[in-house]
Regions:
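Short coil/turn segments at beta-strand junctions that form active-site/ligand-binding loops
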Residues: 1, 47-49, 81, 149, ...
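N-terminal active-site segment of His-dependent metallophosphoesterases
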Residues: 1-70, 350-355, 359-362
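Conserved beta-strand elements of the Class I
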Residues: 4, 124-126, 223
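His/Asp/Glu-rich metal-coordinating catalytic cores
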Residues: 22, 50, 59-204, 208-213
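A short, well-ordered alpha-helical element
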Residues: 37-47, 142, 256-270
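A conserved active-site cap/scaffold subdomain adjacent to cofactor or substrate pockets
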Residues: 188, 194-258
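Accessory, non-catalytic peripheral segments of nucleic-acid enzymes
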Residues: 229-362
Length: 362
């Protein structure tokens, strides 16, 4: 039994991170569609009979009917594949939802908030989703009805949340899930992929197949699974999608003496055009770092943000000449430096000086 498992595509969600780049948000929406097309093409090429979409397929507040029609058109291209959709907290099963009002392809089954079992050949698929934008009901007690069949649970929510967590979205316990005897538990809601192995049982978050910001770094993709009909042995593969990813790039700017040097330093880096970058500046600087100005001076469209984590470089000898509190601090540190012998002690004193100067400059 082969399947694809995905979640959290958030179709038509506003790409706030890309808002200041001309046409980037529209391009990202097109990329979202293309990611779904990639998965459908994979299904066609590999003859996959099941497609699981575990919540937040689209963004209820922003979704366009044209997008729904496009996605449904893709679903019609795979008539022999059974498609199961779980409504999530961003696309709940509510009165004006396209899940309720749109005529979907005949191979699509949409779950509601009530637990339901769908029988398919040698497979029983259980599922339930959201009927509102927030749902913190405890996970319902579920036991599989026929252990001889392959049993799959699909839902959307938080797994093993802390007692201190303020908002819990359909909280679930891995211990209870394990006891319920499912052969595969496909989840959505967490955008980072996670395979949890509980005594051979897989509880899987596929992660989002396309990221929308720097809180979702690195490669994105979907899960391809296979459960042996006889042994029920499970194998999983993560398949990357081609959409642009978000990455962080740490840059030591110590050797930049002027703002222009820093701009040139960044422009000389060979960035991957299929990635969006946030540059994090480290090291020391001896000029005021204006990240917005530097970003505007760059010739690179895929640099989205610059964050300054560098520290000011202080000339302790020059500062000691000042008639000020800063000068007194510098003189005091210089006197102490003459009295210590080890490099470690000197480093501690210089760090104390930097902390003091940073405090003065706040």
């Amino acid at each position: 039994m082969k399947f694809i498992h995905t979640a959290d595509l958030h179709l038509d969600s506003p790409a706030v991170t890309l808002a200041e780049i001309p046409n980037a948000t529209s391009a990202r929406r097109i990329e979202q569609r293309m990611v779904m097309k990639e998965m459908v093409e994979y299904i066609i090429k590999n003859n996959i009979p099941y497609f699981f979409i575990c919540g937040d397929l689209y963004e209820q507040e922003y979704i366009r009917q044209s997008t729904i029609e496009y996605i449904n058109g893709l679903f019609k291209m795979i008539p022999d594949t059974k498609i199961f959709i779980i409504p999530g907290n961003h696309d709940p099963y509510i009165n004006n939802s396209f899940y309720k009002t749109f005529k979907w392809s005949s191979n699509v089954h949409i779950f509601t908030s009530k637990l339901e079992k769908v029988e398919c050949d040698n497979v029983d698929i259980y599922g339930y989703g959201f009927n509102d934008f927030y749902m913190n009901n405890n996970y319902p007690q579920i036991e599989v009805q026929n252990v001889d069949k392959i049993n799959i649970l699909l839902t959307h929510g938080d797994l093993d949340t802390s007692e201190n967590e303020v908002r819990k979205y359909n909280p679930m316990s891995s211990r209870i899930l394990k006891d319920s005897k499912f052969d595969y538990i496909g989840l959505g809601h967490i955008h980072k992929k996670s395979f949890e192995d509980y005594e051979g049982q897989k509880i899987v978050y596929p992660g989002s197949p396309i990221s929308m910001g720097f809180d979702e770094l690195g490669e994105r993709g979907f899960i391809v699974g296979n459960i042996d009909d006889e042994s029920k042995k499970l194998s999983l593969e993560f398949v990357k999608t081609s959409a642009k990813t978000f990455e962080e790039y740490y840059l030591d700017m110590t050797n930049a003496n002027l703002e222009e040097d820093l701009v040139q330093m960044i422009n000389n880096i060979k960035f991957d055009n299929n990635k969006y970058y946030k540059i994090i500046l480290t090291g020391k600087h001896n000029f005021e770092v204006d990240t917005k100005k530097i970003l505007a001076l760059l010739n690179l469209q895929n640099i989205i943000k610059i964050k300054d984590e560098s520290k000011m470089s202080y000339d302790i000898s020059e500062i000691a000449k000042q008639v000020s509190l800063k000068g007194l601090l510098a003189k005091n540190i210089l006197n102490k430096l003459k009295m210590v012998n080890t490099d470690e002690e000197k480093e501690e004193l210089l760090q104390a000086f930097e902390v003091g100067m940073d405090a003065f400059n706040k």
